[in-house]
Amino acid sequence: MGAKEACGVFGAHSSKGTDVVPKILKGLEGLQHRGQESWGIAIPGKPVFKRMGLAFNWINFARELSTYKGASGIGHIRYSTKGRSNLGNAQPIQFGNEFSIAHNGTIFNTDDLKKTVMGSRPGADCSTDTKVVAHRLLQILKEENDWFWAFERLAKEVVGAYSFTILNKQGEVFAVRDPRGYRPLCIGIHEKSGTYIAASESCALTAVEADFIRDVAPGEIIRLGGPKRGFEAFRFAPKVAPAHCSFEYTYFAHPSSVINGVNVYEARKNVGRILARSKRMKGKVVIPVPDSARPAALGYSTESGIPMDEGLMKDRYRRKGSMRSFIEPKQGGREEVVRRIIPIKETIKGKDVIVVDDSVVRGTSSEIIVNALREAGAKSIKMAITFPPIMHPCYMGVDFPSREELLAYRVAAGETDIEVIGAKVAKSLGVDELHYNDIDGLAEAIGLPKDSLCFACINGDYSKLGPVKPKKELKA
């Protein structure tokens, strides 16, 4: 608990000319768990409409949005990994009359791309990685004049993670996923309105009553609309070993989503079950840290035979009570969200408690929860962490920006024994016992081949991304 990930994207195109704006807004609400800082939509012939805050607040702007109607458009939910959290960096981003773009991920080699962009556009705004890569795309499009071939060229220059939705001036919508498939992206259809949809997760399709078709394959661009009036797919990069983010399955994604053929809820239950089987602890009650750890706690309880109960509840009736701590842009905001988690003393007092959480990142959230459990009278506190120790930064779209901010690294730098790391983290947090899942257990729980998942934040293996070094700008 306590990390951020870059955003959710959405796109829609109706072959029947149906207004897709209501679906975009509902779709963004369905992706709210992926970002809480800002939201926005783009349709042909209108300025991008974007606001700070949560997507369901669109109702406060209903009068302004009433003029936004169109048969195609894109939307975005933002949490910042690069660039400051302000309206200027909110997305979608419009580039003249050519296109608007929404991005989930992080582009690593922005410095190299920036030099190329600035060579012909010295005044270009390159304040975020999305703006840099979009400027470069614009340059290539002027030479290629074909979206499919443009991405074939762009892919050879860009290093990083990207799932894009793009709206061009012709009203076509494109869904693009990087060759490794770091971030999720899928397409679906709303049959009644003839609307094809692209979204970060299938839960957004459910939100607009659309049917899932398939994932966008890594290295694939799909055009919604266009001359074929359905969808058209093109592979812009050769097939390489995928590197799907393993953290999506334990924390980021919505439990109802199916990503790369795996139901997230089942993966989380499995990871709890496997953790209980491999790391047995004695306790009287299993308590999840709300909300993402609930399925894992159920799995842990089922496997261990220790009853599960709700000992921590989010106060959803106070400011920020229902929000996610990991994707708050500032530490103070993260702590405020966690302090809205209220212990239920009757469940906790006098008991040996096993707390199941999805991860330990910076450790500040865990410290607050542990203190709350102590104050509620827990006899002992043991922790089961479903994601292995996070020891390295992420350059593919998650806010693990520097080793020094990672608790496991701070207390166990250089250590490779997962049990020793767990013991040192337990001591730092003031708990009686703490056990992590390991990479093999996590891969087994997810149900995908181990070599198709990214574990770089755990083992520091960035070979699929390329040679990388820590970069200060990733703290932005």
Q: How would you name each of these model-derived features?
A:
Residues A155, Q170-E172, R177, E209-D215, ...:
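PRPP-dependent phosphoribosyltransferase catalytic core
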Residues A204, D211, G219-E220, I274-K279, ...:
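Phosphate/diphosphate-binding loops
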Residues T81-K82, N109, V173, Y182-R183, ...:
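Flexible loop/turn segments at secondary-structure boundaries
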Residues E143, R280-K284, T302-D309, K345-K349, ...:
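Secondary-structure transition/capping motifs at alpha-helix termini
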Residues S256-S257, K282-E310:
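Hydrophobic alpha-helical segments characteristic of transmembrane helices
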Residues M1-P218, R223-K284, V289, K349, ...:
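Conserved short alpha-helical segments that host acidic/polar catalytic motifs at enzyme active sites
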